[in-house]
Amino acid sequence: PHLICIVPLILEKIYRKQIKPSLEKGVVKLAMRVPLLDTQVYASVCNRLTESFGGEFTQVIAGGAPLNSEVEEFLHKIKFRFTVGYGLTECAPLISYTYYKDFIPTSCGRVLDGLMEAKIDSPDPQRIPGEICVRGEHVMKGYYKNPEATRQVIDEEGWLHTGDIGTMNEDNTLFIKGRSKSMILSANGQNIYPEEIESKLNNMSCV
């Protein structure tokens, strides 16, 4: 295949069930501590992972859910050809994407130039997370025979309120933190996103 679109869970399962256990074996674990040998180990792992997806592809695009931070960091370390996209059914479906060579870790790509506009409902979109709002040719006109549901997500200016919370840098690259409905406001005013806690728990070997 030229292009592979998958959910993050597939990459995470391959990493936890196959890759991580193999790197914790005696000889391999020792080699990982030796300069130059570690790069050879990473190259070998990358080649095996690439072959497991058929070998002849340009890139793997993960989407549909957050990618575990440990898995993402490792895939970048071994130089695996992957990127992360972001979309909604209401946007038919892609909102942001970046070619793997230009992909920024922890992001979900750049808003599609010329097709989609995006803004963060925040006083400081680059630093303070807020709701991600989008509009453009690909955004739906409304839910079928459900004007009330449509009014709840699309405002008078045509912005679709996604319900996702995140930030956006100067070149319109999106960084998703979590869902507005799941966000917890602590007693000291700090926003807590369960998705970030879940990601850390998933990195534990006992989980």
Q: What spans do the regions from the language model cover?
A:
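ATP-dependent adenylate-forming carboxylate-activation enzymes
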Residues: P1, C5-I6, I192-E198
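Extended, hydrophobic alpha-helical segments in both membrane/secreted and soluble proteins
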Residues: F82, E90-P93, H161-S180, P194-I197, ...
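Short acidic amphipathic segments
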Residues: L201-V207
